Amino acid sequence: MAKHTTVLLDEAVNGLGLKTDGIYVDGTFGRGGHSRHILGQLGAQGRLIAIDRDPRAIETGEALMKEDPRFTIIHGPFSGLAEYIKELGLAGQIDGVLLDLGVSSPQIDDADRGFSFMRDGPLDMRMDPTSGISAAQWLAKADVDDIGWVLKTFGEEKFAFRIARAIVADRTETPFLRTLQLAQLIERLCPKREKKKHPATRSFQAIRIYVNSELEEIHKVLDGALEILAIGGQLSVISFHSLEDRIVKRFIRKQEKGREYPPGLPLTEAQMQHGKTLKSLAKALKPSAEEINENTRARSSVLRVAQKIAEPESE
């Protein structure tokens, strides 16, 4: 199994404001780094529910569940957070939710998962290989406009449509089935703009985000977390690129701002507080230089922490 170093471990767990008898959710179990750290600080009455859609993560979680009765693992996308917690009868009782967004190091390092442009493997990229369509299946059917839009929107790729045209032209003779096949095509088409970044980085990120509906999942899990947190419960979220962080930042700001009224309208103090459901507990936190030196994946990570102060208004 690939070694996985958990990013911002102490900081993200501290962002939950742990109580020894609290009930917490690790929405992105992965290989269990955050979960084990949380369990290490909970007492006998504490409880941790973890979620992951990766079957290999579930195997690790099920082994931990056998060892620790305080721990429960759920197989599914984290967008189902509110539904899972309601089924457990714990809505409104959750003291903290931790989310570590994006793809994990073991997923990238396992060539068979198809996430890596450095290792040859099947062009899959699904977080859950048992569900949805693979990257190869999508690239075989999508047109130039769709591929170009995905690369530009989710990868912020300058050469998005150049790459899209080449994929559509080349696939008529040879379908794109392998990761290095796609990575080498992109490398031929695109100049290396950033010294430490492979030319295929942005395109692989974009296709992965699209195949897994990652940004839509983030919107849903943030809404779900707000719904199931107890008043005073805390949300601790690690993002790994600007698209993720933008969603998290805007969500927290919107919930801090509350209901919007027409400009110039005289408001009471109660009206000014109306609709405010979260307050940010700290400025966005980035890893230390020491952590980045030890784990280069940490370099782009950002942690945001907020606390629930009121129930959201019903629609």
From Swiss-Prot:
- Reaction catalysed by this enzyme: cytidine(1402) in 16S rRNA + S-adenosyl-L-methionine = N(4)-methylcytidine(1402) in 16S rRNA + S-adenosyl-L-homocysteine + H(+)
Tell me if Transferase is a UniProt keyword of this record. Answer: yes
Gene Ontology terms, MF aspect: rRNA (cytosine-N4-)-methyltransferase activity
Q: Which GO terms describe its cellular component?
A: cytoplasm
Keyword rRNA processing: yes or no?
yes
Q: What is its EC number?
A: 2.1.1.199
Please name the InterPro entries in this protein's record: RsmH (IPR002903), SAM-dep_MeTrfase_MraW_recog (IPR023397), SAM-dependent_MTases_sf (IPR029063)
| Predominant subcellular localization, coarse grouping | cytoplasm
Q: Where in the cell is it found?
A: Cytoplasm
**What positions does the entry give for S-adenosyl-L-methionine binding?**
32-34, 52, 78, 100, 107
Taken from the record, one Pfam family name reads Methyltransf_5
Q: What does this protein do?
A: Specifically methylates the N4 position of cytidine in position 1402 (C1402) of 16S rRNA.
Q: Which family does it belong to?
A: Belongs to the methyltransferase superfamily. RsmH family.
Q: What is this protein called?
A: Ribosomal RNA small subunit methyltransferase H
